[in-house]
Every structure is written in C-alpha cells, then in structure tokens.
Swiss-Prot record:
It comes from Rattus norvegicus (Rat). It is found in: Nucleus. InterPro entries: TFIIA_a-hlx, TFIIA_b-brl, TFIIA_gsu, TFIIA_gsu_C, TFIIA_gsu_N. Transmembrane segments: none annotated. This is Transcription initiation factor IIA subunit 2. Its main location: nucleus. The keyword Cytoplasm does not apply. The gene is Gtf2a2. Keywords: Nucleus, Transcription, Transcription regulation. Belongs to the TFIIA subunit 2 family.
Length: 109
C-alpha cells in the first residue's frame, strides 16, 4: 500500500473532486473511484522517487518533532529555503517524512 500523503495536494484534491462528480452523475462506481485513488497513490510516490532531482537547502529552528508508525513529523519556525538563485523565508513549516523505499506491499506489476 502506498502512502496517501499526496491526496491532500492540489493535484490530489482536483482528482478527488473530479471522481466525486463522476460518482454523483453515476458515470463511475465508488469502487472504481477508490481504485483510481489507489493507483494515483502508487504513481505519485513512484514518480517523485524516480524523477525529481532538484535540490533545495533549508534552515530553521526546530519547534517540535515526533516519530510514530515509521513516520517522522517536524515543525520548524523561521525557515529559509535556498535554491540556486532563490531564497524564500517562511514563519512555520511542517515536514512529514515517510520511508519511500517500501511501504510493505508485495505487488508485482
């Protein structure tokens, strides 16, 4: 089973809204919509792991951290993100980090 973190992104929310509309108009079943979301979870996790190669450095003050169920959560204050030509400052950032190598599924494709 893939992590479902990216369902709360702009892309994930748009997909869920579109699927809800299709369900309401009875063009697809709720079971098919669930299958689409599960495939989205697998695809987005795979794409981010394999295709994204950009590097961003950041620095901030650690407010809180937590490790639960193999998931790290960090809350940072006064954070600076640096890319090659850009600097972005934000007051607060929450980072959720999961093991991206294997989420325990034994699927073969």
């Amino acid at each position: 089973m893939a992590y479902q973190l990216y369902r709360n992104t702009t892309l994930g929310n748009s997909l869920q809204e579109s699927l809800d509309e299709l369900i309401q108009s009875q063009q697809i079943t709720p079971q098919l919509a669930l299958q689409v979301l599960l495939q989205f979870d697998k695809a987005i996790n795979s794409a981010l792991a394999q295709r994204v190669r950009n590097r961003v450095n950041f620095r901030g003050s650690l407010n809180t951290y937590r490790f639960c169920d193999n998931v790290w959560t960090f809350v940072l204050n006064d954070v600076e993100f640096r890319e090659v030509t850009e600097l972005i400052k934000v007051d607060k950032v929450k980072i959720v980090a999961c093991d991206g190598k294997n989420t325990g599924s034994n699927t073969t494709e």
